[in-house]
Amino acid sequence: MTAREKLIVGLDVPTVQQAEDIVSKIGDEVLFYKIGYQLVFAGGLEFARDLVQSGKKVFLDMKLLDIDNTVASGVENIARMGMSMLTLHAYPKAMRAAVKAAEGSGLCLLGVTVLTSMDDSDLVEAGYASDARSLVLRRAEQAREAGMGGIVCSAEESTAVREILGPDLAVVTPGIRPAGADLGDQKRVMTPYDAIKAGSSHLVVARPIVRAEDPKAAARAILDDMLRASFPANQ
């Protein structure tokens, strides 16, 4: 897998026009894009289809969670759209229903473990008795047992998660920041280089690229950092 296949640019912008502008500026530098609630509710599903038709890959970040039948119905529809990845919260019954619904489609289902904007104190406030690391590892095991394609977690847990999931399942990591970058609302973060070294298979990067004066150059710098981690002899 090349660095271009591992980097996912998060199109966390309010309008399709802004998303189209970013994709145009980045050009062929990036292959993979993430689309979430904000853009979906502004007409982003049609835009996602357009990206797929143009040869790009789309990670639909919907974080689904509902009764089994509703999750399965949603996954079936999304699988027909040609998306490459889809998120749902890593609850066992929902994951099992989603896996069955996506069977044979090629859609990679990802279990969301603990948001990278949350730390142990946030989990306590939300009523969880577990710390972030323990909860991530438990949900990673449940995702593997359910037959999911991988999980979403902080790079801080990537090494331990990789031991649970093995070499083939996806470990998708948000909260990626180049050295010295503003952390924003993220709490459990890592640089692109360190995240790849830790065992992450895909990195999701939004603000450091989409808010850059030159998004293409910003993406190129992150890709270079990822390449250094993958091929250290070329440094």
UniProtKB/Swiss-Prot annotation:
PROSITE patterns: OMPDECASE. The lineage of its organism: Bacteria, Pseudomonadati, Pseudomonadota, Alphaproteobacteria, Hyphomicrobiales. Catalyzes the decarboxylation of orotidine 5'-monophosphate (OMP) to uridine 5'-monophosphate (UMP). One of its GO terms (cellular component) is cytosol. SUPFAM superfamilies: Ribulose-phoshate binding barrel (SSF51366). It comes from Agrobacterium fabrum (strain C58 / ATCC 33970). The active site is at K63. Its EC number is 4.1.1.23. It holds the Pfam family OMPdecase. It comes from the Bacteria. The gene is pyrF. GO terms for molecular function: orotidine-5'-phosphate decarboxylase activity. One of its GO terms (biological process) is 'de novo' pyrimidine nucleobase biosynthetic process. Substrate binds at residues 12, 34, 61-70, 116, 177, 186, 207. Keywords: Decarboxylase, Lyase, Pyrimidine biosynthesis. It catalyses: orotidine 5'-phosphate + H(+) = UMP + CO2. Belongs to the OMP decarboxylase family. Type 1 subfamily. SMART domains: OMPdecase (SM00934). Pathway: Pyrimidine metabolism; UMP biosynthesis via de novo pathway; UMP from orotate: step 2/2. This is Orotidine 5'-phosphate decarboxylase. Homodimer.
